[in-house]
Amino acid sequence: MKEQVKAATPAGAGAEQRQTLSERIGPVAQRYGILIALIVLCVVLSVVNENFLSSRNIINVLRQTSINGILAIGMTFVILTRGIDLSVGSVVALAGVVSASFATTSASGFIPGAPYFALLPLVIGLVTGIAMGALSGLAVARYAVPAFVATLGMLSAARGLTLIYSGGRPIPALTDGYRWIGTGDIAGIPVPIILFALIFGLSHFVLTRTRFGRHVYAVGGNPHAAKVSGLSVNRIRFAVYAISGALAGIAGMILAARTGSALPQAGVAYELDAIAAVVIGGTSLSGGIGRVSGTVIGALLIGVMNNGLDLLGVESYYQQVIKGALIVAAVMLDRSRKTEL
């Protein structure tokens, strides 16, 4: 009997050691897994295609990622509070069309006797995005409309407003000052990449170093406890949708400036890419858990994947399948972590 106990002890100790090793690896994989995946993907693509690591291609990847990255950062604020914003793609189109129309008409003397201010169209585009986000936030926070329903309605409404405002036609011939935000550069670095980096830095600071950021996590972690502790849950929820709308407005102007015309059909399904970047980056759809840095890495992973598949000649249809699989896998991983806890 004693021998059986002694014989069983090493096996138990081994299991304990294996559990300890798993516990050690788990947090590391959870925190840096997406970054490791991005690095591995870059290494594989650089081996398969020698043009992948060229400076021109890297700049191209970052430029293409900037729009989705900006949208995803705004989406992160919303998802951290247990919300969702399905309207960002339509807001991209609306902000682009409205701001571009002012960039064109102001320059051609649409406002008699008024000087043309290069910043005016940008301010109008930003305000348009904030207004759309604020309306969604009002519906969610003040009238308790489910976020999915409120933003789905805004998706349709904003797209309709875009078509009405533009007459269903693109708005071309933008001024050089407006196009600079999409095609210009500073010290050789494209402006969209710089804006993406600045928005990331500011958002990271807000979420990690400010009271508002702590309140966002508190509302997402436990809304009832946050309310009991004196936090204005409705104001926080309203604010995050306004932030998402503002960043969608910026993304819309960058897109219009880069393409040289504002298309009323722009931004279709952009919300899916943004949600994918957030979820792949480790932010929980249940709220309260996530980081902007993870979202940025998630956006980069999607951008690198799309670019790599393009270089390999893979059709875009397959890219959508892979992207969908990544989203499902990321959600399954998040659910499994919660089950273990």
Please give the residue ranges for each predicted region.
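Membrane-interfacial amphipathic/re-entrant helices at transmembrane-helix boundaries
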Residues: 3-72, 107-120, 185
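Transmembrane alpha-helical segments in multi-pass inner-membrane proteins
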Residues: 248, 258-324
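Transmembrane helix-bundle core of multi-pass membrane transporters
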Residues: 143, 147-210, 236-239, 257-268, ...
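Hydrophobic alpha-helical transmembrane segments
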Residues: 31-36, 61, 68-69, 90-94, ...
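Hydrophobic core segments of alpha-helical transmembrane domains in multi-pass membrane transport
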Residues: 34-46, 75, 126-129, 158-160, ...
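Cytosolic-side transmembrane-helix boundaries in multi-pass membrane proteins
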Residues: 1-41, 228, 232-235, 307-341
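Membrane-embedded helix boundary and interhelical linker motif in transport proteins
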Residues: 80-135
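Helix-loop-helix "hairpin" substructures at the membrane interface of multi-pass membrane proteins
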Residues: 117-125, 131-136, 140, 188-262
